[in-house]
Amino acid sequence: MENAISTVPEFLPALPEILLAVGAMALLMYGVFRKDCDARETSLGALALFALVGAFLIIEPNAYVETFGGMFVIDGFTKFMKLLILLAAAAAIVMSLTFIRREGMDRFEYPVLIILATLGMFMMVSANGLISLYMGLELQSLSLYVIAAFHRDNTRATEAGLKYFVLGALASGMLLYGASLIYGFTGSVQFGSIATVLQADGTNIGVIFGIVFVLAGLAFKISAVPFHMWTPDVYEGAPTPVTAFFAGAPKVAAMALILRVLFVAFPSMESEWQQIIVFIAIASMVLGAFAAIGQSNIKRLMAYSSISHMGFAMVGLAAGTPEGVRGVLIYLVIYVVMNAGVFCCILAMQRKEGYVENISDLAGLSRNQPMVAFMMAMLMFSLAGVPPLAGFFGKFYVFMAAVEAGLYPLAVIGVLASVVGAFYYLRIVKIMYFDEAAEPFIQPMPGELTAVLGISGVFTLFFFVYPAPLILASQAAVRALLP
């Protein structure tokens, strides 16, 4: 008994993760034992669980705490990232309520899988060693593989799930190989110990190879070039609310992990990993911008858009400074909110025969549904980085960090990629406002989509009026990561 009491403090820092795990199991049992349980019931349970976990995270102190032998850490940075992940996951569940019922996916397991994926993301964000990193990554990935193929009767969804699984397994293998190299050359799996060893002994070629493989595995999770090949097919084939989830929360978790790995485990090797990050950032920005131009399916276009946006976020990471990390965090928040709004508009693209996904189907939307068209146009301008919308400030902070760090060519390439990207965003605005009206969509938009779209639109439009809370919160998170 005494032993059990002494272990209680070990578990307290991980209470949000424990709540998610217990909640997922409880909802799973509720769905199994209650006859005719549908996704709406378990979705409401999942949202209540997210609210409880979010409340705990908000009242939790910002102190730095390590537990489970130093493999699990909580601080102000993990709190910031976990709240953003919760926000993205909750939005994905809310956006899917009407869709899953209309598309014959109304099964109680759907929200449970999102909870389990969120649990994996929480573990990734709090990982303080290579083993806990891999555990969190795999828990997230296994849930996402199943969600991608959740619409069993749809061959595109099944194909998307299979592609994601095969390529995800390859990326996990690369990450694990890199982790084994790092462990072999440093003798430790804990980030702090790895940093200490490298500080004392200096760098060697084996550790550099290890970093390359670990970054390859993590770059896959944020769809960064050249590990982006799965993204367009999976985004197009997966059910639309699932695509909205993929485009938000997993990217936040993987970016948090990249930040912690590079700045906590390998600060002494900044000159080595900075070159890799600069290459990935340039390749992602340029390929994402040019590849999206020829797309006719709006979900494929959003896939290439997400590749490009992760490239922009990595510009701040490449700077290797506290200002750069702050820029990354602000960029991620703005990106997640804008993304949720765009996918609400995509989910409103429904006719009598079902959901449509072609960009040409938006023709004349301004005459049929002027409010939806206005919101979509505003979000497109924001994604393009037009001031004074939120998207402009996201890019401004990461480009300024790159300039202050002396990475002038990277900042210039980023600005040019933004100009190219503006073309395909503005093409959507042109189609909505100036093309001949197509057959109108079913009206009105479901209430839950209207709510998420409204929040996204207000944030995007009025962010410039009062950006201080987000800037201060991101600065506090950066101070926790880089004391």
Curated annotation (Swiss-Prot):
It is a multi-pass membrane protein. Signal peptide: none annotated. Belongs to the complex I subunit 2 family. This is NADH-quinone oxidoreductase subunit N. Its main location: membrane. It comes from Parvibaculum lavamentivorans (strain DS-1 / DSM 13023 / NCIMB 13966). HAMAP family: NDH1_NuoN_1. One of its GO terms (molecular function) is NADH:ubiquinone reductase (non-electrogenic) activity. Its EC number is 7.1.1.-.
